[in-house]
Amino acid sequence: MNTKRPRRPLTLRDVSEASGVSEMTVSRVLRNRGDVSAATREKVLTAARTLGYVPNKIAGGLASQRVNLVAVVIPSLSNMVFPDVLGGISAELDDTGLQPVVGVTNYSPSREDSVLYDMLSWRPSGVILAGLEHSKAARAMLDNAGLPVVEIMDVDGQPIDTAVGISHRRAGSEMADEILGAGYRRIGFIGTHMPEDHRARKRLAGFEDRLAEHGVQLAAREYYQGGSSLQKGRELTERILSREPDLDFLYFSNDMIGAGGLLWCMERGYDIPGELGLAGFNGVELLDGLPMKLTTTDARRIDIGRRAARIVAGKEI
């Protein structure tokens, strides 16, 4: 876990000083009220974006207080990973009086900016969000929010405040060690082609770097876009093995497509793991229902959610 102390929250005065106009004018611009010239409006909005200032939607005497909400920002609800994380967060917050409120970004940096802006305007008691890679605007908002910020799932980078997760580079590297140690050399990779899925990218980088240290390169790779599914795993496995039938191992970027690949290979009579080895990533419960075990890496999703919630709730420093 990496930590860094947050700064004090920004105020209208900060935006006023940065833009060179009065606090009253700043307030009118940010609330979209009153007659303000286009040039002044742009000057104020630019200063607010640069500083990371988010207007406070809580009125009157409550304006200096925080609400009993924890903003949870995740990239997706369509896979099996983040519901487990949310379960851990919810379970840990259950006796604290804090309630998680979820925003989904669909792996879009601009969408993450918008979700964070809206959530921070209600002055939550903390923020939990996935990953360490964010836009400059998002980092500015979080860095100046003056509340606990926990970035989850990844520790390969510098956190804004606190990071809780695993090293994906190490996960990829250690899987390569296991595969090479078992004697496999003709290795194929099947994974997502999403530039904003930074954790999958880091795992693959760690995997390939360790292979290279042993003089081995990926013999084939197959990428897909969009969500993961068993059917997609079947299709991609058929495609890569039709093109490169002498592969002796397939490394999948997640368990869902890995499970689909395993089922396809079993239906066609592959000797697993003798003729062909397979591995995925995440350690999801789905694997327990398969007729054969798929090698995987446990990403500790529930534990990550629980620890992030403990930090936001002040149970753990």
Describe each model-derived feature in a short phrase.
Residues 1-68:
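N-terminal helix-turn-helix DNA-binding module of bacterial transcription factors
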Residues 38, 42, 51-118, 122-126, ...:
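Amphipathic helical "hinge" segments at domain boundaries
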Residues 107, 130-174, 256, 282-294:
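Flexible loop/hinge segments that line or gate small-molecule binding clefts
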Residues 110-123, 231-246:
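Short, well-structured alpha-helical segments in soluble
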Residues 186, 218-221, 272-277:
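Short acidic capping loops at alpha-helix termini that bridge into adjacent secondary structure
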Residues 243-317:
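Flexible loop/turn connectors
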